[in-house]
Regions:
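Non-catalytic helical "accessory" subdomain of NTase-fold nucleotidyltransferases
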Residues: 1-264
């Protein structure tokens, strides 16, 4: 059995994933690309490469996603925005509404409707909301195709997710920070960097029985956190991760009954 494991590891390194050095070079390339885009680009948007390629993998059919984070719009929990009312850093502020959304999703209440374009908002008896559908339409360019929370170019080579940033670490996830970790992973230094990092909101809602996305919900995304955790893995763990991705694509995704249960 040990001999089979060694042969599989060698095959994955030589033919599928690449060596540890190759994986690190891929990551460094996309990190430099992000730095260039952010130094030379529009200050309104911050760019973070995402997807398998940015994680250092180049599997068959690997995706390349770009998270574009709007720096002018801030999202708060209600208690946070009330306590910081006089020190808000931007005119465009949104408030999380978790109670009326499915787990893992949120509605976004508009804090001051006077600052917002009317085409972006949706009003009903429960309040005033930022619509994910209108947001994607506002961010789209000619010939863009909507692909879940992303906008794809005409060739389908790059998926762009125009996201909003959660200013604080979510209260619903604070238990993750302090829970016991008997194996010492992730280390305290990494947890500290993760909490200081970005939790994003991407424009896609949960699916109803009709398989249509809820146009008012936004998915809470820990993709930046996931990327930081993946960067901390050993190369053996990366190999296992790649095997799971191949299993998902080559086996699970081909079963139409369970395909929609997985998003990546």
């Amino acid at each position: 059995m040990e001999d089979i494991s060694v042969k599989l590891y060698k095959y994955m390194c030589d033919e599928v994933v690449g060596s540890e050095k190759v994986v690190n070079c891929r990551r460094q390339f996309f990190n430099v690309l992000d730095d260039v885009n952010n130094d030379c680009g529009d200050n309104e948007w911050r760019v973070i490469s995402s997807g398998s390629k940015a994680e250092g993998l180049d599997l068959p059919g690997s995706d390349f996603d770009v998270m574009l984070i709007n720096e002018d719009i801030h999202v708060y929990e209600l208690n946070d925005i009330l306590s910081k009312y006089h020190n808000l850093r931007t005119r465009y502020n949104l408030v999380l509404n978790l109670e009326n959304a499915m787990p893992g999703f949120t509605l976004l209440n508009i804090y001051d409707v006077r600052e917002w374009d009317r085409e972006l908002i949706f009003i009903n008896e429960d309040g005033i909301f930022l619509s994910n559908k209108s947001w994607k339409r506002e961010c789209s360019r000619r010939n863009d195709v909507i692909n879940g929370p992303c906008l794809s170019d005409a060739l389908g080579t790059v998926d762009r997710a125009f996201s909003l940033k959660y200013v604080e670490w979510p209260s619903t996830s604070r238990q993750w920070i302090d829970r016991p970790r008997f194996c010492g992973w992730p280390p305290e230094s990494l947890i500290h960097n993760i909490v200081r990092g970005r939790v994003l909101l991407v424009p896609i809602g949960s699916k109803s029985d009709s398989q249509k996305d809820n146009p008012l919900e936004w998915r809470i995304s820990f993709s930046v956190t996931e990327k930081m955790l993946i960067y901390s893995w050993t190369h053996s763990q990366i190999i296992c991760y790649a095997l799971l991705k191949l299993l998902l694509k080559e086996v699970i995704k081909k079963n139409e009954n369970i395909d929609k249960l997985f998003c990546s």
